[in-house]
Regions:
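C-terminal transmembrane bundle of multi-pass solute transporters/carriers
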Residues: 1-155
């Protein structure tokens, strides 16, 4: 409704997000072993909700595609580095259990979040729902940034 598009428009938006995700994954892979994972995690954790906030206001398809490209990149940057840090920082004897809980909470909460977003979108509207969820995500990211400064120093 907002972009006055159809299923093809949605396909292009998802493809833009996927292209950004692929670019980010290739970027991270090209770095090999690097010592600034915490800084990249912080950048991605703040960039993702910022660009989702921007997306909630955009009504032009080409600009939406650009925003989704950056959003996909920031999301994969965050997810990839968070996963890597969990696996490398947890002691060997606990890694399996910690990864099990991490995966369960990470992927297990997606459907609940999708349900909540669907209900909110039905009552408030799509753009408003994206705005609210992005604002909550940005707030949490900034709280972590300011109150857990050690994250920026993770290697």
């Amino acid at each position: 409704k907002i972009l006055h598009g159809d299923s093809a428009t949605n396909g292009f938006l998802q493809s833009a997000r996927g292209a950004g995700a692929l670019a980010s994954a290739l970027f991270i892979a090209s770095l090999g072993r690097f010592s600034f994972k915490g800084r990249l995690l912080t950048i991605g954790s703040i960039a993702f909700p910022l660009f989702m906030l921007l997306f909630s206001f955009v009504t032009i398809v080409p600009l939406s595609l650009t925003v989704m490209l950056v959003t996909g990149s920031a999301l994969i940057l965050t997810m990839n580095i968070a996963n890597s840090l969990v696996q490398t920082l947890v002691p060997d004897k606990l890694r399996g259990r910690v990864m099990g809980v991490y995966t369960l909470t990470f992927f297990g909460l997606f459907p609940l979040g999708a349900l909540l977003m669907g209900v909110l979108a039905e009552h408030l509207g799509e753009a408003e729902t994206i705005f609210i969820c992005a604002l909550v995500t940005l707030s949490v990211s900034l709280l972590i940034f300011f109150f857990v400064p050690a994250i920026k120093k993770l290697e």
